[in-house]
Amino acid sequence: MLSYCLLVTGPAYGTQQASSALQFAQALLAEGHKLESVFFYREGVLNANQLTSPANDEFDLVRGWQQLGDVHQVALNVCVAAALRRGIADSQQATQLNLVGANLQPGFILSGLGELAQSVLTYDRVIQF
């Protein structure tokens, strides 16, 4: 059994990266591997946008990640710098920066690149999507 971290750099919609990452994560867990963390970076931070509203006939990828994190206790880390550049903030950042409101999906955590560096050093595999 290996421990994994996924690095997601693609947005929730518009490319296949994030949906492929979620399917890979589900397959890892089904095979008995341990998925410790998913780190969302660059455009991947858009997977944590609470205001995303897909069409009724589309899979809700943001809530799919949230469910994966909740059910399997996977840390959903979002790069704080990349998130703020793309208009995603939690309540603490929104207050600190005098933003209108927060829109980080529950279950996701704003974190720094140090969290990703720690994952690279700690887990058996880091896979980028």
From Swiss-Prot:
EC number per UniProt: 2.8.1.-
Organism per entry: Pectobacterium atrosepticum (strain SCRI 1043 / ATCC BAA-672)
UniProtKB keywords: Cytoplasm, Transferase, tRNA processing
One family name in Pfam for this protein: DsrE
Quaternary assembly: Heterohexamer, formed by a dimer of trimers. The hexameric TusBCD complex contains 2 copies each of TusB, TusC and TusD. The TusBCD complex interacts with TusE.
Protein name: Sulfurtransferase TusD
Gene Ontology molecular function terms on file: sulfur carrier activity; sulfurtransferase activity
Main location (coarse class): cytoplasm
